[in-house]
């Protein structure tokens, strides 16, 4: 596979002004199945398999996330592979990674953006693609947790308490998540909360820029625009969830 990687790099790389194309999820799956050959700096990671023997994964609008494991340490990671181009994504994630590197909190996980990290044999003109590496968060989304525990008054009271503590902590930070919603909040097995999906995050280095998203409709202020991009953009969502 590495020979094919070198061959394609020499013979088929074309210069283009068009938006970068990305592989299909099925093509990423095939690449991850042979992770040791197709990953560069992360070649020591192996995919965690589901009950059907396939790489464990979940997908969203712009990416697919694989559960990977370092067999030397036993630690699991989330490897995010992109399926669509998003303008400014690389620089944004570099800035986010720099901001979060020294944040010591269970509410946030560190992120690492790696350019040209995964080789994928696909119909795209490129054959090497970026990935985002994050700690794997065990648990379930807050939306799922509420659906399963809404009749348990104690569980709901503790969830409300922990959410309000997280909200107070987040509002004291110089950054903002950018897309607060129950689907982007993980409830760990011990009940503690962790924010995931940082695509819309604001960090101080982005001051003066436009937001890449205005959040999710049901949890975003109706008057918010891409020009509203600072450390206060989570206020409406946090208040809406806290009061519901």
Regions found by a protein language model. Give the residues of each.
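Juxta-kinase regulatory segment immediately upstream of eukaryotic protein kinase catalytic domains
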Residues: 2-56, 91
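Conserved end of the kinase activation segment
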Residues: 223-232
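Activation of the activation-loop gatekeeper triad in protein kinase-fold domains
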Residues: 197-202
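Catalytic-loop of the protein kinase fold
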Residues: 167, 171-183, 187-188
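Conserved activation segment of eukaryotic-like protein kinases, specifically the C-terminal portion
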Residues: 208-223
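Conserved structural core of kinase catalytic domains
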Residues: 109-156
């Amino acid at each position: 596979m590495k020979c094919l990687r070198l061959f394609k790099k020499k013979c088929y790389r074309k210069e283009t002004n068009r938006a970068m194309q990305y592989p299909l999820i099925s093509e990423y799956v095939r690449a991850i199945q042979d992770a040791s050959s197709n990953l560069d700096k992360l070649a020591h990671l192996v995919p965690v398999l589901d009950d059907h023997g396939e790489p464990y994964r979940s997908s969203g609008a712009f990416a697919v996330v694989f559960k990977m494991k370092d067999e030397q340490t036993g630690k699991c990671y989330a490897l995010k592979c992109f399926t669509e181009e998003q303008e400014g994504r690389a620089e944004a994630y570099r800035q986010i990674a720099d901001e979060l590197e020294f944040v010591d909190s269970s509410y946030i996980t560190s992120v690492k953006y790696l350019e040209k990290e995964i080789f994928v044999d696909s119909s795209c003109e490129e054959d090497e693609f970026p990935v985002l590496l994050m700690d794997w968060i065990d648990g379930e989304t807050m939306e799922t947790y509420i659906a399963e525990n809404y009749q348990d008054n104690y569980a709901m009271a503790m969830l409300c308490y922990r959410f309000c503590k997280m909200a107070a902590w987040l509002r004291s930070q110089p950054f903002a998540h950018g897309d607060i919603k129950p689907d982007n909040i993980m409830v760990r097995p011990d009940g503690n909360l962790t924010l995931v999906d940082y695509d819309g995050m604001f960090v101080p280095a982005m001051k003066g820029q436009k937001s890449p998203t205005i959040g999710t409709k049901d949890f975003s202020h109706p008057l918010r625009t891409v020009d509203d991009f600072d450390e206060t953009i989570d206020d409406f969502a946090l208040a809406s969830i806290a009061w519901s």
